[in-house]
Amino acid sequence: MRRRRAAVAAGFCASFLLGSVLNVLFAPGSEPPRPGQSPGSSAAPGPGRRGGRGELARQIRERYEEVQRYSRGGPGPGAGRPERRRLMDLAPGGPGLQRPRPPRVRSPPDGAPGWPPAPGPGSPGPGPRLGCAALRNVSGAQYVGSGYTKAVYRVRLPGGAAVALKAVDFSGHDLGSCVREFGARRGCYRLAAHKLLKEMVLLERLRHPNVLQLYGYCYQDSEGIPDTLTTITELGAPVEMIQLLQTSWEDRFRICLSLGRLLHHLAHSPLGSVTLLDFRPRQFVLVNGELKVTDLDDARVEETPCTSSADCTLEFPARNFSLPCSAQGWCEGMNEKRNLYNAYRFFFTYLLPHSAPPSLRPLLDSIVNATGELAWGVDETLAQLETALHLFRSGQYLQNSTSSRAEYQRIPDSAITQEDYRCWPSYHHGGCLLSVFNLAEAIDVCESHAQCRAFVVTNQTTWTGRKLVFFKTGWNQVVPDAGKTTYVKAPG
């Protein structure tokens, strides 16, 4: 598997002329044909599978209708006047996406909807900007990863920008299990591709700073599969929890705040309350320190129907919650509560309280406890996270700190080379680099470290505007350095 993907990425990097390379990367035609099968033919259904084709068509139609519902669920944020257009495709001559030819909607047998999908009644918002033409001369292709349905690659556009490409993984479990069951590769591709299309629609409809940006998409005929779909999105770094536990509390708090803002947006989205059925960290990425959801094919908008509260049990591995059944026959707030508890068990409990400023711990503990008990909704949770941000950013969390009586000599436009020591958590693995609100906090930190004899205030700031400071064991090697200020502990 790895050998195959490495070869794919190498070919991808060499040219990526869409008419040929996308065929190799994303189409089953890149696989050797079976004995007695022409390279462009689809696998024929085995004995007894004719009835199975009807089941496959039913599943395709079900996913197609889901995509249509999300597409016409009202204008997304910032949407202008709705325009008639093919679902997620701009009209010929439009300002954004370009196709090498007009789209052809094909009607498969057995009652399945055509592919690509037919037009919806309205636009999901301003169209993405990139299309097939943007991918003609990409470079530096790298395989990022794959899941049940999709494979993700990292490429660099001719202008230098790095983006992510998503497509149905022809070696993946989703497509493979479908082909084994129904023996219809094209139909199974359409079934899997509707999940990618659903994600594309939701990325457009749910646009938000903590939702991955959709830059564009491309439909391309491939060997044996017409109109294979590739989406072009913002590129992020995978969420590695072990690495995050070694970062500063300030950066970990930013991730939790990002998540709180995302959940608030999902609870009040233009489509209604959206729940993420798969909430594992791998469904998110980090972009410049901000957490963003990237995988939306398992998102659900509809609340759970019920006839009584007995139907409204929210189940998790460690515990269950009982929610009320509304008079309208829906479990009240189940989508919101599911998101919130998953945020608690996957993120808040690990990232929020540890190594936080002592004066903020009571507030942070209350956030963790309340989300773990589902005592708060997303509105109150976000309000408390924003309060913690205000206290931290304004320096009010320092109101109970006592200023040190130690005196420090100020040496402007200077720095100390070497003489480092390690502390945790630090922004620098080889030294002690921490953020401080002001000079008084820097002195307090130095006084609390037995080995600290000096510190250097840099000209760098964190996302909250706090200064980054190097703490040192001495000042034997003070050198000129414009923009930095060294403070050394006075003798005595």
Curated annotation (Swiss-Prot):
Biased composition (Basic and acidic residues): 52-69
Ranges in coiled-coil conformation: none
Gene3D superfamilies for the chain: Transferase(Phosphotransferase) domain 1
Disordered as annotated region, ranges: 29-130
Result of altering Y148F: Does not affect kinase activity nor secretion to the extracellular medium
Glycosylated sites: N137, N320, N369, N400, N459
Domain of life: Eukaryota
The enzyme's E.C. designation: 2.7.10.2
Signal peptide bounds: 1-32
The Protein kinase domain, residue ranges: 138-422
Consequences of knocking out this gene: Morphological defects at birth including growth retardation, short limbs, cleft palate, sternal dysraphia, shortened intestine and cyanosis. Long bones display reduced mineralization due to delayed chondrocyte differentiation. Neonates breathe abnormally, do not suckle and die within a day after birth, probably due to insufficient respiration as a result of the cleft palate.
Annotated positions of the Phosphoserine modification: S177
Family of the protein in this entry: Belongs to the protein kinase superfamily.
Protein name: Extracellular tyrosine-protein kinase PKDCC
Protein source organism: Mus musculus (Mouse)
